[in-house]
Swiss-Prot record:
InterPro entries hit by this protein: Na/ntran_symport, SNS_sf
GO CC field: plasma membrane
Coiled-coil stretches noted in the UniProt entry, renumbered to this chain: none
Designated name of the protein: Orphan sodium- and chloride-dependent neurotransmitter transporter NTT5
Keywords on record: Glycoprotein, Membrane, Neurotransmitter transport, Symport, Transmembrane, Transmembrane helix, Transport
Gene Ontology biological process terms in this record: amino acid transport; neurotransmitter transport; sodium ion transmembrane transport
Subcellular location: Membrane
Residue ranges of the TM segments: 139-159, 177-197, 199-219, 264-284, 290-310, 338-358, 383-403, 496-516, 534-554, 568-588, 609-629, 659-679
UniProt family annotation: Belongs to the sodium:neurotransmitter symporter (SNF) (TC 2.A.22) family. SLC6A16 subfamily.
Membrane topology summary: Multi-pass membrane protein
Organism, as annotated: Homo sapiens (Human)
Tissue specificity: Highly expressed in peripheral tissues, particularly in testis, pancreas, and prostate.
Major location (coarse): membrane
Ranges in the topological domain labelled Cytoplasmic: 1-138, 680-736
């Protein structure tokens, strides 16, 4: 289909004056309920209206654009031409309760950028990126990721930011305005965001549980617990490592299989509830409180990561870890699976397709430079990933070194016992002094043995290899809760470093949870006027609902379901949602038309390359990623690592057939609103392209919108006046 700019007038500007708006306790936005404020004198009001008219006229004179009548001018002219009578000032109780002025703004652009960065800095994305770097090509994967980030990630992030900011709508309503027939994509993104929010705080509850246990000395995952009424260690723990035992048996109380049910784990219910209380407390007072909390939640992990990185550079094995960081497998550049993994990671790290990006951007002025914001957020996110991955590899190098040292010492003890028992000849006696660098001393001794003695030794002991141990880093949450916690226990003082590490993860998790919940709360407020006036009631109700539903994932088998959704399922609906978003802007609204509107709003030209990326390259790349992942999913069975209580070992099990059926069912449910809303539009004869011009356009939200294209300077002026209007509510209502 064509993506040419339409000759009709734009729909982008002035949406904040006519669309749904949120009442919030931030500067420049309030819900006015004081009846006295509605009865200002006509003389005072007229004077203020004249000042407003003069300001708008000055803004029009400064631009070369054809003069257009803005909503503010229409209100001003109407007010100046007629005296505000007592009857017009009077409002019914019903109308008075619905007086909601301008949508709130972020207190500063810094808060907004930090909110977007905090939403994208999910702990799971950080450790998954490091895991993929380690196991999917090294620097080759990193190069592919960076290429995909700027080719696909930044344009799509810019698209969502521009849509939300221009339309002043959350992730559910914005697409109804841009493309009525594709309006169902907003409902799909809302449902995906809701499902993600159900289990996201469960991961945060794991972090809080570990943090609460880190005050013990030694930390409980450093040594096996003693059996009750005995001086011996727990035999189940002795058959594995303390960190693995603590993860499965103490933290998760994991079942042997996903089929095993059980009630919620009580030791996780309280941390889970605490997570929701913290997120609710941060959001209950709107953007004013959220913005201040974001400073701490985003900046604190950055300082901790830098401090950790400096500290780990001084550890033994850090150099080996950094050497593994720069390893590149050139053959993986030609592997489509690696490209699809990098593309999926770009979608996860940028957070597009969930509606949260558009919701956060909807609280910015329409003239804000969202293109530079998209680049800035992406670059900050990329730098955070690179620093965090470098820190990860330093820690893993230290962890692998310590484990290998202990392996060599254990082998030496085993060999001495076998020699004393006469099972090995005296020539197989290992070096006595393994205190300093035991791995080098042990390996040098082993390589110097005669071949027949060496063969006898290797049959009795395990191989101790630092490269092999380095590659044993676990996937998913276990990357942090197994490999990392064990490494922190090796680092004195282990209590301090463990607490700081989990504090960093918790801050990241909470900032991401705020972004996810903003993608749920904002669309509900935009859609239902009742929720705009009762924000606190909405937040409490939604959080209680999600807490109750999320208890399902705190059961003994809950971690297996989280892996099913996060590693295998969620990327598919996100790709479909993003593809339809590009269709909405590129085909229904028109990519060139959208860019032309943004050029006027922002006051500077935007590269026409986006008019080619959105309708052509991005959808094709996303569909290739979708097909590649689908083929990989069909060819290779999906698996999960479970706990076998009989052997106290981790066991790789395939997901049962009903798990795949569950994925398909969930996918169908969240995608269903797209065709369903299309059918609704066809039945009600809603046009494919949004109407525009002088007449009102009725969007799928049934909101009459009269949109006029306004130059950048004028938009900025109206944004200033919009804040001024909140001081004089009668100005906005005297002509209604």
């Amino acid at each position: 289909m064509k993506t040419e700019a339409q000759p009709s007038t734009s729909l982008l500007a002035n949406t904040s004056w006519t669309g749904t708006v949120i009442s919030d306790s931030v500067p420049g936005s309030q819900t006015w309920e004081d009846k006295g404020s509605l009865t200002r004198s006509a003389t005072s009001w007229t004077s203020e209206a004249q000042v407003s008219a003069a300001r708008v006229a000055e803004a029009q004179a400064r631009t070369s654009q054809p003069k257009q009548i803005s909503v503010l001018e229409a209100l001003t002219a109407s007010a100046l031409n007629q005296k505000p009578t007592h009857e017009k000032v009077q409002m019914t109780e019903k109308k008075e309760s619905e007086v909601l002025l301008a949508r709130p703004f972020w207190s500063s652009k810094t808060e907004y950028i930090l909110a977007q960065v905090g939403f994208s800095m999910k702990p799971s994305c950080l450790w998954r990126f490091a895991y993929l770097w380690l196991n999917s090509g090294g620097c080759s994967f990193a190069a592919i990721y960076i290429f995909m980030l700027f080719l696909v990630g930044v344009p799509l992030l810019f698209l969502e930011m521009a849509a939300g900011q221009s339309m002043r709508q959350g992730g559910m309503g914005v697409w109804k305005i841009i493309a009525p027939w594709i309006g169902g994509v907003g409902y799909s993104s809302f449902m995906v965001c809701f499902i993600l929010g159900l289990y996201f705080n469960v991961v945060n509850s794991w972090i809080i549980f570990y943090m609460s246990q880190s005050f013990q000395f030694p930390v409980p995952w450093e040594k096996c617990p003693l059996t009750m009424n005995s001086s011996g260690f727990d035999p189940e723990c002795e058959r594995t490592t303390p960190s693995i035992y603590f993860w499965y048996q103490q933290a998760l109380k994991a079942s042997d299989r996903i089929e095993d049910g059980g009630s919620p784990v009580y030791s996780l219910v309280l941390p889970f509830f605490l997570c929701w209380c913290l997120v609710g407390a941060f959001m209950i007072n709107g953007l004013k409180s959220t913005g201040k909390v974001i400073y701490v939640l985003v900046l604190l992990p950055c300082f901790i990561i830098v401090g950790f990185f400096i500290r780990t550079l001084l550890l033994e094995g850090a150099k080996f870890g950094l050497q593994q960081l720069v390893v590149a497998k050139i053959s993986d550049v030609y592997n489509m699976s690696v490209w699809s993994l990098a593309g999926g990671q770009v979608l996860s790290n940028t957070g597009i397709g969930l509606g949260s990006v558009a919701s956060l951007a909807s609280y910015m002025p329409q003239s804000n430079n969202c293109l530079s914001d998209a680049f800035l957020v992406s670059v900050i996110n990329l730098l955070t990933l690179l620093v965090f991955t470098s820190f990860n590899f330093c820690v893993l190098g230290f962890w692998a070194t310590v484990i290998t040292h202990r392996c060599c010492e254990r082998n030496a003890e085993i060999l001495l016992k076998l020699i004393n028992l006469g099972k090995l000849p005296p020539d197989a006696k290992p070096p006595v002094n393994l205190l300093y660098n035991p791995t080098s001393i042990y390996n040098a001794w082993l390589s110097g043995l005669p071949q027949h003695i060496k063969s006898m030794v290797l049959r009795e002991v395990t191989e101790c290899n630092i490269e092999t141990q380095f590659l044993k880093a676990s996937e998913g949450p276990k990357f942090a809760f197994l490999s990392f916690v064990e490494a922190m226990s090796f680092l004195p003082p282990s209590v301090f470093w463990s607490f700081i590490f989990f504090l960093m993860l918790l801050a990241m998790g909470l900032s991401s949870a705020i972004g996810i919940m903003q993608g749920i709360i904002t669309p509900l407020q935009d859609t239902f006027s009742f929720f705009r006036k009762h924000t606190k009631l909405l937040i409490v109700g939604v959080f209680l609902l999600m807490f109750v539903c999320g208890l399902f994932f705190t059961r003994p088998s809950g971690s297996y379901f989280i892996r099913l959704l996060s590693d295998y399922w969620i990327v598919f609906p996100i790709i479909v949602v993003v593809v339809f978003e590009t269709m909405a802007v590129s085909w229904a609204y028109g990519a060139r038309r959208f860019l032309a509107d943004l050029t006027i709003l922002l006051g500077h030209p935007i590269s026409p390359i986006f008019g080619w990326l959105w309708p052509h390259l991005c959808p094709v790349v996303l569909l290739i990623i979708f097909v590649t992942m689908m083929v990989h999913l069909c060819m290779k069975p999906i698996t999960y690592m479970s706990w076998d209580s009989s052997t106290s070992k981790e066991v790789l099990r395939p997901y049962p057939p009903w798990a795949l059926l569950l994925m398909i069912t969930l996918f169908a449910i969240v995608i269903l609103p797209i065709p369903a809303y299309f059918v609704y539009c066809r039945i009600h004869r809603i046009p494919f392209r949004p109407k525009s011009g002088d007449g009102p356009m009725t969007a799928s939200t049934s909101l009459p919108l009269s949109h006029q294209l306004t130059p950048s300077k004028e938009v900025q002026k109206e944004e200033i006046l919009q804040v001024d209007e909140t001081k004089y509510p009668s100005t906005c209502n005297v002509t209604s």
